[in-house]
Curated annotation (Swiss-Prot):
GO terms for biological process: DNA-templated transcription termination. InterPro entries: aCPSF1, Beta_Casp, KH_dom, KH_dom-like_a/b, KH_sf_prok-type, MBL, Metallo-B-lactamas, RibonucZ/Hydroxyglut_hydro. Its cofactor is Zn(2+). There are about 2100 +/- 500 molecules of FttA per cell; RNAP is estimated to be present at about 3000 molecules per cell. This is Transcription termination factor FttA. Zn(2+) 2 binds at residues 257-258, 364, 615. Homodimer. Probably interacts transiently with RNA polymerase (RNAP), (via at least the RNAP stalk subunits Rpo4 and Rpo7), interacts transiently with the Spt4-Spt5 complex. Binds 2 Zn(2+) ions, which are required for nuclease activity. The gene is fttA. GO terms for molecular function: DNA binding; exonuclease activity; metal ion binding; RNA binding; RNA endonuclease activity. Keywords: DNA-binding, Endonuclease, Exonuclease, Hydrolase, Metal-binding, Nuclease, RNA-binding, Transcription, Transcription regulation, Transcription termination, Zinc. It comes from the Archaea. Zn(2+) 1 binds at residues 253, 255, 341, 364.
Length: 648
């Protein structure tokens, strides 16, 4: 991973000399080191650094680095004693539910039902905690639904703290190595997701650095390796992996077509560098990757990777919140912005070569407000090239208005329940499931729904992760949670399905019900089992609320096939007679439709010099590219996989 480390120690020596001159002697500086994209200053007396409120800002300005001040590890109280003391300092009314320590950054995470009481008036209690235990406290509200995924991730980071710190220092030295070249050229190569949906992977190359944006798997094409995985056979990518030259991977969001192949790289030791993404994306992609290998096991298929490979992904992930600017290579600076697609989804902005070129890569995005999220960000400091999705880029790809979609959903549900049927809504565990939950929750609150809403698959765990990150949700939901004291995710109408026996009981029951189950495309997961048993009964309905990829069972049902062969777990093929009503309501998609895509181009600022359309069926990428050029006069391309485009 580490390349051309020459001069790093000399650079650090110069930085230390500047810091010693600017920082009060009583701070007791013990070490200065690059850790990941930050410059970390370790001190014996952190309080001395806080007396001058402008000190850190001035240091960052002079050094042109992101500065973090941490207590020297030697002054930290042992976690057991620190926890005991924190509980003595914080009033019991705060209702602390968990205290966890991250030795790699000297931080203690305090979860409490009333975080304001942990902070104290004007931050007095927080300062007292810092003085007494020396750990840097971070206070968060206790998630109303406990997430096993989040707990496991925190446990891994705590257990592996020594290796984690060593890793961060290696990353820091790689980022701040002395550049051997002044950036003169930039190009991108499509390794997957160009003129197709699935296996998204884009390689950004300069004469100094290599960065990969997304690395997904096409779950609809797993039987065909030539279509399922990114192009490992691309000469430049093979060279980068063989020589260990890849500086970083950036993940736009958690869905498997963007993150599903990450653990594979660690299984075969093809990469050991940093992965950058938002905290919710790290948690959600962990959940989805774990589910992916479980489903492969259940289907009798050798999984692409193992749980310990997912653990390696966690250990190598560096999280950024929206708007935080970080150096990730000597000539590349990264900022993540809200994409409005799913929890934690990001538009990637890359500032290359100190003003040479700026790229925004949208990933999957939504450009209108939804119940869960604010619209995608469309303003950037600088922008020359925009790489944008085209899932609904065709000239006729206009989705139903959101209000109309919600009305239609309620109508179909009401009609189905009235005739004693069950409603099956296949949904991705992350995104559409929670969006539909919010629609149904509001309708239930006014008495419109009186039957249980069953959540099957990973939906309950994914929802728990949503409740842990309210700051990433829409303003409306944040106001409900923080100001009105009401959390819509906790409505008792939602029932979690614990196992296959409960699932069968729901199917066998003669009572009407609403079932939201994974997967959204009927590719594995409990939604397939529900479909097989509910499809023959005309009283029932299936409602598709998200994109159905070519080659999936969902696409076959959506097209109106009435007899569908399905291979069972025993290897036998059974023909399913589809007599249930089939409905598609596009208005709930997390992807921008044609209207939103064109609107985004009209509103994005600064106006880009070039737009590249990706992540869509070939004719949709081409249609959108052509339309943008005709309407806005902007240079456009709709490249194929393996095409390389020089941007500068």
């Amino acid at each position: 991973m580490i390349r051309r480390e020459t001069f790093v120690d000399d650079i650090l020596k110069e930085i230390r000399e500047i810091i010693v001159q600017m920082v009060p002697r009583e701070a007791g500086i013990t070490d200065v080191e690059f850790e990941g994209p930050e410059l970390v200053i370790y001190v014996k007396n952190p309080e001395a650094m806080m007396k001058d409120g402008e000190l850190i800002k001035n240091l960052a300005k002079v050094l042109k680095k992101r500065i973090s001040v941490r207590p020297d590890p030697d002054i930290l109280l042992p976690p057991e004693k620190a926890e005991e003391l924190i509980k003595q300092l914080v009033p019991p009314e705060a209702e602390i539910t968990n205290i966890s320590f991250d030795p790699s950054v000297g931080e203690v995470l305090i979860e409490a039902r009333k975080p304001g009481l942990v902070i104290g008036k004007n931050g007095e209690t927080l300062r007292l905690i810092t003085q007494k235990v020396h750990w840097a406290p971070r206070v968060v509200r206790t998630p109303p639904i406990q997430s096993q995924t989040i707990y496991s991730i925190r446990s891994i980071l705590q257990t592996e703290s020594k290796d984690r710190r060593k890793f961060l220092r290696q990353v820091g030295r790689n980022i701040y190595r002395k550049s051997e070249y002044k950036s003169r050229w930039i190009r991108i190569t499509g390794l997957g997701g160009f003129r197709e949906v699935g296996r998204s992977a884009l390689l950004v190359q300069t004469d100094e650095s290599y960065v990969l944006v997304d690395f997904g798997v096409n779950i609809a094409a797993l039987k065909d390796p030539t279509k399922a995985y990114p192009h490992f056979d691309a000469p430049e990518f093979r060279y980068v992996l063989d020589e260990g030259l890849l500086d970083a991977i950036i993940i736009t969001h958690a869905h498997l077509d963007h993150s599903g192949m990450l653990p594979y790289l660690f299984r075969y030791k093809l990469f050991d560098g940093p992965i950058y993404t938002t905290p919710p994306t790290r948690d959600l992609m962990t959940l989805l990757q774990q589910d992916f290998i479980e489903i492969q096991h259940m289907n009798g298929v050798e999984p692409l990777y193992r749980p310990k490979d997912i653990k390696e992904v966690i250990k190598h992930t560096i999280t950024l919140d929206y708007g935080e600017v970080r150096d990730i290579a000597p000539d590349i600076r990264l900022t993540l912005h809200n994409a409005g697609h799913i929890l934690g989804s990001s538009i990637v902005h890359l500032h290359i070569g100190n003003g040479l070129h700026n790229i925004a890569i949208t990933g999957d995005f939504k450009f209108i407000p939804t119940r869960l999220f604010e619209p995608a960000v469309s303003r950037f400091p600088r922008l020359e090239t925009l790489v944008m999705e085209s899932t609904y880029g065709g000239s006729n790809d206009y989705q139903m208005p959101r209000e109309e979609a919600e009305k239609r959903l309620i109508e179909v549900i009401h009609q189905t329940l009235k005739r004693g049927g069950k409603v099956l809504i296949p949904a991705m565990a992350v995104g559409r499931a929670q969006e539909i939950m919010m629609v149904l929750e509001e309708y239930a609150r006014v008495g419109g729904i009186e039957v249980p809403i069953y959540l099957d698959g990973m939906i309950w765990e994914a929802t728990a992760i949503h409740t842990a990150y309210p700051e990433y949700l829409s303003k409306h939901i944040r106001e409900q949670i923080f100001h009105e004291g009401y959390n819509p995710f906790l409505n008792p109408i939602f029932k979690s399905v614990a196992n296959s026996r409960e699932r069968q009981d729901i199917i066998d029951s003669g009572e009407p019900a609403i079932i939201i189950a994974t997967s959204g495309m009927l590719v594995g997961g409990p939604s397939v089992e529900y479909f097989k048993q509910l499809a023959p009964d005309p009283k029932n309905s299936i409602i598709f609320v998200s994109y159905q990829a070519e080659g999936t069972l969902g696409r076959q049902v959506q097209r109106g096939l009435r007899e569908i062969p399905i291979v069972g777990e025993d290897g036998r093929t059974e023909v399913i007679n589809v007599n249930m009503e089939v409905h598609t309501i596009d208005g709930f998609s997390g992807h921008a439709d044609r209207r939103e895509l064109m609107s985004y181009v009209a509103r994005v600022r600064p106006r880009p010099e070039r737009i590249i359309t990706v992540h869509g069926e070939a004719h949709k990428c081409l249609d959108l590219s052509s339309s943008i050029h005709k309407k806005f006069g902007i240079s456009t391309r709709a490249p194929n996989n393996l095409d390389a485009i020089r941007l500068k």
